[in-house]
Amino acid sequence: MRIIVVDNYEEMSKKAAAMVASQVILKPDSVLGLATGDTPIGMYKEIINIYKNQKMDFSKARTFNLDEYYGLNRENPQSYYYYMMNNLFNHVNIDKNNINIPNGMADNIEIECKEYERKIDKAGGIDLQILGIGVNGHIGFNEPNISFESETHLVNLNEKTIESNSRFFSSKEEVPTKAISVGIKSIIHSKKIILLACGSAKSDAVSKTINGKINPNIPASILQLHRDVVVIIDKEAASKLNLK
């Protein structure tokens, strides 16, 4: 696990974007695992800037998003499909047929989850997975005490997660209580992982992920076992780390 501590959010975003750009430039048909939320927005903006400077070509790249709210249609501004289109896909030359995001409105969620897992396998797995981390240590929507053997599945969202995500909605009551998420087993099979965190609110989760014991109560702690993880965090998120 390589840990990069930067001064601020902007620097974190630029470093992460440069790594994604390098991946796509070196392997144009890369399979990218993408995350949503506040943390990666700056990274996506930087990726768009690199693309506009004609240094990236997304035409052969394939993407798989980590998760999607259950019960939100794609046109809903809070859906992750809407988020990805608005923050990245509508601004680069990616083939829309190469975009994969779980369908939160699927009639049969079990089939949707199995099919999503099959698509990842058929693509050859994820070359580069981007992750954020929740204040409770979740990655994707894999909440505390999730099985490390989990694949894509329907999740009951933790109260902390609902509370945290309520800032995106008019009220807490509007926040979906379930989501489809790629599982821990699927994430850990990615060839390379970049974990992003910014701000003091994430410092406890970051510390437990890196310095603590591997524990299902901190889902991100399983990343300690991965052979190629880069953690990019600002000074506030790193404030509780023991880097000796």
From Swiss-Prot:
GO molecular function: glucosamine-6-phosphate deaminase activity; identical protein binding
Annotated active site: 67, 136, 138, 143
Pfam families referenced in this protein's UniProt entry, alphabetically: Glucosamine_iso
Family matches, as PROSITE patterns: GLC_GALNAC_ISOMERASE
GO annotations of cellular component type: cytoplasm
Superkingdom, natural source: Bacteria
Pathway(s) the chain acts in: Amino-sugar metabolism; N-acetylneuraminate degradation; D-fructose 6-phosphate from N-acetylneuraminate: step 5/5
InterPro entries reported in the protein's UniProt record: Glc/Gal-6P_isomerase, Glucosamine6P_isomerase, Glucosamine6P_isomerase_CS, NagB/RpiA_transferase-like
Disulfide bonds: none
Family assignment from sequence similarity: Belongs to the glucosamine/galactosamine-6-phosphate isomerase family. NagB subfamily.
PANTHER family, A to Z: GLUCOSAMINE-6-PHOSPHATE ISOMERASE
Role this protein plays: Catalyzes the reversible isomerization-deamination of glucosamine 6-phosphate (GlcN6P) to form fructose 6-phosphate (Fru6P) and ammonium ion.
Protein name (record): Glucosamine-6-phosphate deaminase
Lineage: Bacteria, Bacillati, Bacillota, Clostridia, Eubacteriales
Name of encoding gene: nagB
